[in-house]
């Protein structure tokens, strides 16, 4: 670089020599540095040399600056002949002037001056230990870790001693990290002792306190331990080219394997990265691309047992230029624009220097973002300009030269400029024509700007050459302005005229003061106000007028106060009453506009122990944000639980309350509109009552200048897009408005949960990018987002609101109630319940199972099930093995912990065949065998004997009931009526048929029939027999037997028959897949006789079976275990101990047809019943179904 700079300087010198005869062209040699000072760390009394060598056209003068001020040279500090600064003895003791600071050298020649980069001189120091090693006990074979931390400049070198001797680090199991951490893996008895760290710098050496390591003998039994990270990586911020170490120490049995990855799935740089010790990640020569989130993962070999820890690496980078300023040549009265852009982490700040001195934006010279604009160039602007970019990592500078070309035939400057005030906003400016070449003047330009303050904008008005006076209006009242005139001709512009300053007249105030209302007692209101800003005061305020009244009274009371006052106490007021107050200010010209009425309620007379009103202060930060600050009275003894904040725009609805803690003394209100007046009230509260409130008004400033008030705001950002990133963060992206050409300053993001009640939870974030990751959100919560744009002191409206929900949290617990049932010789059913927690979302279950031999080898078989399922089949199990089963729940965010291991014993084939099946094993039955399930032969024998005894007892009870029923029917039958609704709605399941009684007429009207219960006579054959029908009275003759199909009964005819009552008993026999047919017989009976109705059922339940589904490829599992349908389960639960048989039934095949036809027609259709089989043919049944 120095050689290239010399060549460039030589080339420019040659070009300057060639151009020397040409009029109006100057030759010059640019000034540049060959060597610049660098950062230095020195000990006290050391000698230091700060280099500085500049090249350019001689003579060159070098001066030194310290912290922006000139270095005072003496015998100890002076400049060498080559421009370097020499300090013979560095001082820095307390009580003396320290030499520490930032140094810069300034090189100057006749063309200008340049400033070097900053050099930071620091003294070598070392502090006391911030963290010292602690004593610990470690089991033999475990991991021991000691740490110490000390602040030093430069960073201290840390070594370790054991028993006051240097610890040898040649063993692989001992690692000493440069960060001050000592790791000992596979601890042995000989490692026991006293450890301490030693920190050494260039100036001193410090030793820490000793820590004892006790080694406990290891037990013979080494149970399985899940991996655990006992020392994970910490967030690190590093400078460019430094070395970073991310620590990761894990324990477990078997010993876990440590691996590293990046959270963004980018590959880790293998050239600058290596593993230090037993899992620590060391990154050498850190670069910006190394920044990110690093994940340490500790995994038990051969298993899915792992744990992770992560940390963020932030890399800071010094500034570097992306765009450099270029040298310019401009004529007098022209405009020069220098561009400069730099990047770095954090983002660098851009500033401009002219001949080594910082430039402030004012008048003709403006700085827009990182650009420098010089308007109305004058000869004094000919200089060397430098763009300086600096951040916490350093500073860089880039230079450019502005050459001002002067015309030889230009006119002289206008003279005799004078100004006269016309009004509060207008000044008359007059001047004389130039004395030289005035006949060539074609126009004049009038320049004016405010005389007070910095960063004032200069305005320009161009007028013709036919006049020498001009009235400038649109000025602010009671303000000083500076004016000058420039004459123009075809070949260029004249020099500036002399400057003249003039003051505008006063005017009435443009607005009223912002008032604050508080109460010290139930009968007073303290009114205080701030001075009106000079911009709106428009002169000196001489009077204030206070007006107040009760809200229920139209009578107004008025007080006038001197302009020097800033508060007034209203006394003798009514307690617990609302008062309205307003204020007006006046200058010597007259009264301004009064403020709007501000309301305030006086405290209740009983609120003597309520918190006093806080002292409130409001301050606008910008045109959309205000800061609310308050201070509670120190004499207030009332307890304060918190504060309530309310705010509203004048004439709008109030927002709040915003609940704040008792420790809060400041709050920022964002998202306001520019040039609006807002009313804020604040009060303290406790468990008993609310305190006295403080009210105050504030006005937000405008975002545009007076001349730009008609400029419309920019359109809002478009295409706002939200995507959930984690359970606590959402990624936002949006587009810049297509019709906005202005430079975007930043964006404001508004974020809050949907349906938010507390306005203090609204989050406002700032960024200059078109994307942002919003963090710190609640899981599984819907948020609303909006974005607004800020450009050139203008704010856009809020974008349309976008709603998005954060992801749920990963399951925090394992599935519960894990049960295992052996349903076949080689098949087991696993069932479980979802993890505890109402907010837990599960999308998938992972089932791990393995035999003991496979488990020891770390080989698990894996099954996955959807989150809606809570059972699975384990197939192809090997007899004689004990299987271990555990389950974990997971969702799209992550996987939860596994459940406790449940053991399942699969008995040998010969043993399992002698036992009854199925065998049900669950975690709730485990006692001495720790989730081990086993049903031996004796247990199964006992179960079988118990079931047989129960069946025998039930059979005896049924026989007794049948015998007694026969006896009752013979003596005195009782009327029974069956509900037709029950018959129609049971749909084969008639468990409640003996609960309700109805008359036979009711049954006939509903086209349903009840059959007589057939007693258990031995001569009745269920498979077939004669046409003889027998009821409880004996055989029924053909004359008295009339068979009617239920579907074809004539109910009207039945009603007209003689009033007789028939005994009806229903007989049924159910088999899966068949339909019951019942017929009714007419039996002679008295009108008062009725029969009992009983419908016993015996339904054989199907065994459990597996539906076809896609299974796990690892095990060939069918994929799911399906229950019976709901109807079948219902039927199987409604069983009777006594099956009944009769010959009055059709065959199974015929019953199936009738069943299918009847049920498919309608849910309300009754079942088809027939009385006896011989009289009914399949043709008749088929005909009946068709009808």
Swiss-Prot record:
It is found in: Membrane. One of its GO terms (cellular component) is membrane. The chain crosses the membrane at residues 942-962. Residues 1-27 form the signal peptide. Gene3D superfamilies: Immunoglobulins. Keywords: Developmental protein, Disulfide bond, Glycoprotein, Immunoglobulin domain, Membrane, Repeat, Signal, Transmembrane, Transmembrane helix. Residues 413-507, 509-605, 610-709, 716-809, 814-909 form the Fibronectin type-III domain. PROSITE patterns: FN3, IG_LIKE. Glycans are attached at residues 82, 163, 235, 305, 465, 480, 622, 725, 746, 758. It is a single-pass membrane protein. InterPro entries: FN3_dom, FN3_sf, Ig-like_dom, Ig-like_dom_sf, Ig-like_fold, Ig_I-set, Ig_sub, Ig_sub2. In the embryo, expressed in early mesodermal cells, the neuroepithelial layer of the brain and the trunk neural tube, the neural layer of the retina and in the epithelial somite and dermomyotome. From mid-gastrulation to early somite stages, restricted to the posterior embryonic region but this posterior restriction is progressively lost during somitogenesis. As development proceeds, further restricted to the dorsal parts of the spinal cord and somites. In parallel, expression progresses caudally during axis elongation. The keyword Repeat applies. Residues 1103-1134, 1154-1187 are annotated as: Disordered. Residues 28-941 are extracellular. It holds the Pfam family I-set. Belongs to the immunoglobulin superfamily. DCC family. This is Protogenin. It comes from Gallus gallus.
């Amino acid at each position: 670089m120095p050689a290239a700079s010399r060549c460039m300087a030589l080339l420019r010198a040659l070009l300057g020599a060639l151009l020397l005869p040409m009029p109006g062209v100057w030759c010059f040699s640019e000034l540049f540095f060959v060597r610049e000072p660098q950062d230095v760390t020195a000990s006290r009394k050391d000698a230091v040399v700060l280099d500085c060598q500049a090249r350019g056209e001689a003579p060159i003068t070098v001066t030194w600056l310290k912290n922006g001020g000139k270095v005072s040279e003496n015998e100890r500090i002076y400049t060498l002949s080559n421009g370097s600064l020499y300090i013979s003895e560095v001082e820095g003791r307390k009580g003396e002037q320290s030499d520490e600071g930032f140094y810069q050298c300034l090189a100057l020649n006749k063309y200008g001056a340049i400033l070097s980069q900053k050099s930071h001189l620091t003294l070598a120091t070392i502090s006391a230990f911030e963290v010292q090693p602690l004593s610990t006990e470690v089991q033999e074979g475990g991991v021991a870790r000691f740490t110490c931390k000390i602040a030093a400049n430069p960073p201290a070198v840390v070594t370790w001693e054991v028993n006051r001797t240097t610890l040898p680090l040649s063993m692989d199991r001992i690692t000493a990290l440069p960060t001050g951490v000592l790791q000992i893996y596979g601890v042995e008895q000989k490692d026991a002792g006293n450890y301490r760290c030693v920190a050494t710098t260039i100036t001193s050496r410090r030793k820490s306190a000793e820590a004892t390591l006790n080694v406990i003998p290891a037990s013979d039994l080494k149970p399985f331990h899940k991996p655990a990270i006992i020392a994970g990586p910490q967030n690190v911020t590093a400078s460019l080219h430094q070395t970073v170490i991310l620590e990761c120490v894990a324990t477990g049995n078997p010993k876990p394997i440590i691996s590293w990855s990046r959270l963004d799935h980018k590959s880790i740089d293998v050239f600058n990265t290596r593993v230090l010790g037993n899992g620590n990640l060391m990154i050498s020569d850190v670069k910006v691309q190394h920044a990110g989130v690093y994940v340490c993962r500790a995994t038990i070999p051969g298993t899915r047992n792992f744990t992770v820890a992560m940390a963020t690496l932030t890399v800071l980078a010094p500034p570097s230029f992306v765009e450099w300023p270029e040298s310019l040549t401009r004529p007098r009265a022209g405009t020069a624009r220098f561009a400069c852009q730099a990047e770095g982490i954090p983002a660098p700040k851009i500033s401009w220097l002219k001949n080594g001195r910082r430039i402030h934006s004012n008048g003709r010279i403006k700085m827009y973002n990182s650009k420098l604009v010089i308007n109305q160039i004058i000869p004094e602007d000919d200089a060397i300009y430098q763009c300086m970019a600096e951040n916490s990592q350093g500073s860089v500078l880039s230079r450019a030269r502005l050459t001002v070309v002067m015309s030889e035939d230009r006119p002289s400057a206008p003279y005799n400029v004078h100004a006269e005030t016309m009004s509060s906003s207008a000044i008359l400016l007059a001047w004389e024509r130039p004395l030289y070449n005035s006949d060539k003047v074609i126009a004049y330009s009038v320049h004016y700007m405010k005389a007070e303050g910095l960063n004032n904008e200069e305005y320009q008005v161009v007028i013709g050459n036919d006049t020498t006076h001009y009235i400038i209006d649109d000025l602010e009242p009671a303000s000083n302005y500076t004016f000058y005139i420039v004459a123009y001709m075809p070949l260029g512009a004249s020099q500036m005229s002399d400057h003249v300053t003039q003051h505008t007249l006063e005017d009435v105030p443009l607005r009223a003061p912002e008032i604050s209302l508080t109460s010290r007692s139930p009968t007073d209101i303290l009114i205080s106000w701030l001075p009106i800003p000079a911009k709106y005061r428009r002169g000196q305020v001489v009077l204030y007028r206070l007006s107040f009244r009760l809200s229920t009274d139209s009578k107004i009371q008025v007080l006038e106060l001197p302009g020097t006052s800033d508060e007034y106490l209203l006394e003798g007021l009514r307690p617990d009453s609302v008062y309205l107050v307003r204020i007006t200010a006046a200058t010597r010209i007259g009264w301004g506009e009064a403020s709007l009425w501000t309301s305030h309620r006086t405290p209740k007379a009983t609120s003597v122990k309520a918190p006093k009103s806080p002292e409130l202060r409001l301050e606008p930060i910008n045109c959309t944000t205000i800061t609310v600050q308050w201070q509670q009275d120190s004499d207030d003894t009332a307890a304060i639980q918190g504060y309530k904040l309310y705010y509203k725009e004048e004439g709008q609805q109030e927002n709040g309350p915003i609940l704040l803690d008792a420790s809060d003394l400041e709050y920022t209100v964002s998202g306001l509109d520019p040039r609006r007046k807002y009313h804020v009230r604040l009060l303290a509260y406790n468990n008993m009552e609310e305190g006295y409130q403080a009210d105050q008004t504030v006005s937000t400033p405008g975002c545009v200048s007076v001349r730009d008030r008609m400029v419309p705001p920019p359109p809002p950002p478009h295409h706002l897009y939200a995507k959930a990133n984690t359970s606590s963060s959402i990624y936002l992206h949006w587009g810049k408005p297509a019709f906005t050409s202005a430079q975007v300053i930043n964006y404001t993001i508004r974020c809050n949960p949907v349906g938010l009640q507390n306005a203090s939870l609204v989050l406002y974030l700032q960024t200059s990018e078109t994307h942002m990751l919003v963090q710190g959100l609640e899981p599984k919560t819907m948020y609303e987002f909006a974005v607004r744009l800020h450009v050139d002191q203008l704010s856009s409206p809020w974008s349309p609101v976008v709603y998005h929900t954060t992801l749920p949290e990963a399951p925090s617990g394992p599935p519960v109630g894990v049960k295992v049932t052996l349903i076949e010789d080689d098949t087991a059913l696993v069932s479980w319940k979802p993890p505890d927690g109402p907010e837990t979302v599960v999308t998938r279950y992972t089932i791990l199972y393995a035999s003991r031999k496979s488990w020891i080898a770390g080989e698990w078989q894996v099954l996955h099930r959807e989150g809606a399922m809570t059972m699975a089949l384990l197939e192809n199990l090997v007899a004689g093995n004990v299987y271990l089963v555990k389950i974990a729940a997971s969702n799209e965010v992550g996987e939860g912990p596994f459940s406790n291991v449940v053991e399942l014993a699969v008995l040998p084939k010969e043993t399992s065949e002698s036992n009854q099946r199925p065998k049900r094993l669950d975690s709730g039955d485990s006692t001495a065998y720790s989730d081990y399930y086993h049903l031996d032969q004796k247990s199964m024998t006992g179960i079988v004997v118990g079931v047989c005894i129960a069946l025998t007892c039930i059979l005896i009870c049924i026989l007794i009931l049948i015998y007694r029923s026969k006896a009752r029917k013979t003596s005195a039958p009782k009327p029974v009526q069956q509900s037709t609704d029950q018959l129609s709605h049971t749909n084969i399941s008639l468990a409640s048929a003996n609960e309700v009684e109805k008359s036979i007429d009711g049954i006939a009207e509903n086209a349903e029939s009840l059959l007589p219960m057939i007693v258990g006579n031995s001569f009745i054959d269920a498979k077939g027999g004669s046409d003889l029908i027998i009821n409880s009275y004996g055989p029924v003759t053909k004359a008295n037997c009339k068979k009617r199909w239920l579907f074809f009964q004539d109910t009207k005819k039945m009603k007209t028959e003689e009033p007789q009552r028939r005994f009806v008993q229903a007989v049924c026999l159910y088999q899966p897949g068949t339909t019951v047919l019942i017929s009714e017989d007419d039996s002679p009976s008295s009108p008062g006789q009725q029969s009992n109705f009983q419908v016993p059922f015996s339904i054989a339940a199907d065994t459990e079976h597996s539906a076809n589904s896609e299974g796990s490829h690892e095990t060939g599992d069918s994929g799911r275990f399906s229950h019976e349908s709901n109807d079948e389960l219902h039927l199987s639960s409604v069983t009777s101990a006594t099956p009944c048989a009769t010959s009055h039934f059709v065959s199974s095949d015929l019953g199936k047809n009738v069943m299918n036809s009847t049920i498919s027609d309608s849910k309300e259709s009754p079942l088809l019943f027939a009385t006896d089989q011989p009289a009914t043919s399949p043709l008749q049944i088929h005909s009946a179904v068709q009808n």
